[in-house]
C-alpha cells in the first residue's frame, strides 16, 4: 500500500503549507501537483541511491550510481560528504569502502578526460561554545522544539552515548555545510531504510524530514527509488512507518 492510498487530503495540505512557510529553497521543489511537491530532483535521487548502496555494501552497483550522481550535477565534495555522514548510521567499514569505490570511479573518469566539479569545502567553524551545546541547538533546529525534558532511557543508561550524539553527530557532522539539513536527513532515511530493523529511528528521521520541509509524497518517492536495490520486506516496513507517522498527524 502506498502512502496516498491512506493519507487524507488535509494532511497533505498541512505539510504543503509548512513547506511554504519554512521557506525551503528551490532544490527541494521538484515537480508538484496542486502545490504539493511529490517528487525528488535528480540530485536528491542520486544521493538516496548512493547512500543506500554504500550502506548495503553493493559496490558494483555503487560505481554506476556514483557515475550517475556526478553526471546529474553532484559535486565530488557533496558525494564525499554523503559517505562521511552515513558512517554514523551504518559504520566506518561501509563508509570507507564507499569512499574507496568513489576514488576508483573518479580515477576512471579522469582517465577518460572527464573533469568533475570538486565543489565547496566545509566552512570553518567559528562558534566557540562547547560542542555539546552546539549539537543540542542543531538538534533543536532539526526537530523545531526545545529538548530540555528528561533524558531518553538510553541516555540515562549509558550517558556517554548521548554526549557522543550531541558532540559528534549533531555538532561535528551536522555543522559541516557541504550538505544542508534536508540533504543529510534524506541520506539518513535512505540508510536506515536500507539497513532495516530500526523502525523507531526511521520514524524519527522521517518526521524530521517533514519538519524540514519534505512532503509525504517526496518520502514516498524516496521509497520508490530504494525499491530498485533494497529488499521488498524493508521497503514494506518503511512504508508502514511512513503511513503510521502521517496518520498520527491527523
Placement of each model-derived feature along the sequence:
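Short, structured motif recognition centered on aromatic/hydrophobic residues
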Residues: 44-53, 63, 79-83, 183-193, ...
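An amphipathic alpha-helical core segment
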Residues: 192, 207, 211-212
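Alpha-helix capping and inter-helical loop/turn segments
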Residues: 57, 196-197
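Substrate/cofactor-recognition hotspot
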Residues: 81, 85, 90-93
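Bacterial N-terminal signal peptides that target proteins for export
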Residues: 1-14
